[in-house]
């Protein structure tokens, strides 16, 4: 259940950031179909939950560990002029060791935002960004 809380924290953070931009950008989350307008750049966000661990003999501790990925999707053949500024903005948004809390549940960004290689297909150019997270509950 707590991976779901973590997803909701990061989704809310992305939505608030997008709305605050001079030019808001569409953010599409998991299991949502989206047909972009011609020439539109948008984001796709994914939760990649990892292990749920416990480090106490009583079993009252849980560590929720995983990766959060935000992919920038731009039109093919548009170069990096649309993606590079977004990489900078998203890197600043998800700062290393940032603590985000919802209803007493805190998640920490455990790694710097890492940019993966751009992936081109016939219609789009996608730049994946990801970082590791961790949230601890219990003793």
Per-segment meaning from a language model:
Residues 3, 83, 120-124:
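Short capping loops/turns at secondary-structure boundaries
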Residues 36, 61, 118-122:
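Sterically constrained small-residue positions within well-ordered secondary structures
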């Amino acid at each position: 259940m707590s991976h779901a809380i973590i997803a909701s924290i990061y989704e809310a953070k992305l939505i608030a950031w997008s709305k605050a931009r001079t030019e808001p950008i569409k953010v599409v989350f998991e299991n949502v179909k989206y047909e972009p307008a011609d020439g539109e750049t948008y984001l796709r966000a994914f939760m990649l939950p990892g292990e749920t661990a416990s480090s106490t003999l009583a079993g009252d501790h849980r560590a929720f560990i995983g990766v959060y990925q935000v992919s920038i999707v731009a039109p093919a053949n548009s170069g990096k002029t649309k993606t590079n500024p977004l990489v900078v903005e998203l890197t600043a948004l998800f700062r290393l060791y940032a603590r985000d809390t919802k209803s007493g549940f805190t998640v920490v960004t455990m790694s710097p935002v890492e940019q993966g290689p751009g992936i081109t297909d016939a219609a789009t150019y996608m730049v994946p960004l990801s970082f590791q997270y961790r949230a601890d509950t219990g003793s």
